[in-house]
């Protein structure tokens, strides 16, 4: 499994290819815990989209606007403070928004992106239906 995390907490952009056993070593505040929290937050985001009734489009995308309190797991009570180096702020135009992004690949690829929506919620978008369905499965959590 390859995991890429962009703009999450202490992490600007990192890609890690996971092995059966992984050991993270680094100085305090270098992003070790942020990486682990990022994986948990990404899976939680996928599961939340499923629980809240997100529906796959024909293009293989599922998108909902959610409040911080609606996510199954967040490392902090307000998602806007999870953006790398500053608060996550929105924009009326989707192409101008800042995004927290998680890309997971294991023969199939799926990405979860979170931005501040124009109405104050958090636009949560999952691309890649094949792996996305596995990541969203609450009864058999992805491990």
State where each predicted segment sits.
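P-loop NTPase switch/coupling surface
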Residues: 1-143
